[in-house]
UniProtKB/Swiss-Prot annotation:
Name of the protein described by the UniProt record: NADH-ubiquinone oxidoreductase chain 2
Subunit structure: Core subunit of respiratory chain NADH dehydrogenase (Complex I) which is composed of 45 different subunits. Interacts with TMEM242.
Signal peptide interval: none
Family: Belongs to the complex I subunit 2 family.
GO molecular function, one term: NADH dehydrogenase (ubiquinone) activity
Amino acid sequence: MKPPILIIIMSTVMSGTMIVLTSSHWLLTWIGFEMNMLAIIPILMKNHTPRATEASTKYFLTQATASMLLMMGIIINLMFSGEWTISKIPNPIASGLVTIALTMKLGMAPFHFWVPEVTQGISLSSGMILLTWQKIAPLSVLYQISPSINPKLLITMAIASVLIGGWGGLNQTQLRKILAYSSIAHMGWMTVILTYNPTLMVLNLTIYITMTLSTFMLFMHNSSTTTLSLSNTWNKLPLMTSLILMLMMSLGGLPPLSGFAPKWMIIQELTKNDMIILPTFMAITALLNLYFYMRLSYSTALTMFPSVNNMKMKWQFESAKKIILLPPLIIISTMLLPMTPMMSILE
């Protein structure tokens, strides 16, 4: 794709999200979603492979269905309330339709089937945009309508997302699918706390985006797409490989890394609201994600790939490309836990 065209498309994607973030009118929000969806399709298809075309078609059909449900919910809300403002959804049917539409856009269970397939069919750079930037707009609308959402519906979908995000990643060898299932699980953690403390959802989203951006950048740097290719990188780029392993542990929520902080604060907030069974169940299901990240780290760092020569390390390492954003992203992704007492001020 030529740079001028890419700049125009990327600016449209960003403009669509910014319209959703800044508008308090339902029609403008819907227009922002449509701008964002139509502009992201060429980015997903930039490889011009049959798999990328299939992934883009799946994404388009899912997002179009979600947009239709969203518009239906908006119209029902307009019929009953007579208002276009986002913050007020007095009708439970309209609230349910809007919630389902937004969770479908996020790829939460039971509307999660498109996320692994689409992520696997596109390039690493497109997958990075899909699993980070594309989550901001739907979550911002959920944040605004959180007082009107049915908590039981959202908690049920959140629990299903955490379960499926853990189970789905267990037998995967493709790194993009592993990150897609991890994204589904993280969406479950974000939405379970939404009706109790929306600020914690924003904090969780920020840490999730930082960790996922760092992981995708390192995968692009190493050209790693499978667990096998990742296990071959340690003797070429040992520092990068060790950073990837730390980021994976952080994504799994292992203390004392950054990914543990939002889970800790969410469990604490749920227990403050006299909920014991839900945070216990969420903590147990989070072990599924941690397990497949631990297994991936073990196969990468602690086992050697069969080789004909006896040399463990290459005599000359590959020169690392300079990525300006990577050092601060890695620091935030792995060393944010000591800042948790300061984060608790947000509550």
